[in-house]
Amino acid sequence: MFCVIYRSAKRDQTYLYVEKKDDFSRVPEELMKSFGTPQLAMVLPLDERKKLANADIEKVKLALQEQGFYLQVPPPVENLLNTPV
């Protein structure tokens, strides 16, 4: 299984994973509007990998099979002023 990863033109650290290059047919239209023009980041063979840098590989595979896409959003920003020392 391969996946194609696109970077969002509108949202920092937001990535869209799809099964085929330039095939966004299963991605909801509203998501595509808020995502902006997809910028190709990379193509990955998922069968040969055990983990991904910032996403659970099993969740990615399942989402690709069931929904046809996986959306990776950045983690929430931590306010260091509120962190106890």
UniProtKB/Swiss-Prot annotation:
Domain YcgL, by residue range, is 1-85
Entry's transmembrane regions: none
In terms of Pfam families, this protein maps to: YcgL
Gene3D superfamilies on file: YcgL domain
**HAMAP family tied to this protein:** UPF0745
What is this protein called in UniProt?
YcgL domain-containing protein PC1_1941
Organism from which the protein derives = Pectobacterium carotovorum subsp. carotovorum (strain PC1)
Q: Upper taxonomic classification of the species?
A: Bacteria, Pseudomonadati, Pseudomonadota, Gammaproteobacteria, Enterobacterales
